[in-house]
Amino acid sequence: MPIVVSDYKAPSWCPGGHLQTVLPAKLMPRPKVSYRREKVEMPDGDFMLWDWVEPEVKDVTAPILVHFHGLEGSSRSHYAEALMASCVERGWRGVVAHFRSCGGEMNRLPRAYFAGDSADCEWVLKTVHRRYPTADLRAVGVSLGANQLAKFLGLSLIHI
């Protein structure tokens, strides 16, 4: 693989990739997001915590964005709040589906989530679709959540 030479120079006040990653997350204003929490019972006897945002004017056909967070992320992660605020601005519903034992409450079963596990991802998407069959369903994942979503979509014959 060839080495790509770049003439990019980091600003003197913000050298290095670590600082360039951390500063925006800490210094940028965060949108105010109000969630409605739902504890959803799962077929295996466990539960998931879902944090919903909804526009003031509710349209049953409005798109729904399902967000799968990163490792130990939650609906309070800066990226989740920004994404859910954007949903509300567009008139969409949005839901952050917390993986097991994320979202501030330990689960009942001794089952954890991991990057290669797409079963819960599949269950979430199918459950949301059953509840809102006329809504356009969309999904996004960040980091670990993106891996689970990509695995599910790659193995699935379902068009999402």
What is the meaning of each model-derived region?
Residues 55-103:
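Short, surface-exposed "cap/lid" segments of acyl-processing enzymes
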Residues 82, 151-155:
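Active-site signature of alpha/beta-hydrolase-fold catalytic machinery across serine-
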Residues 52, 79-80, 107-110:
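Short coil/turn segments at secondary-structure boundaries
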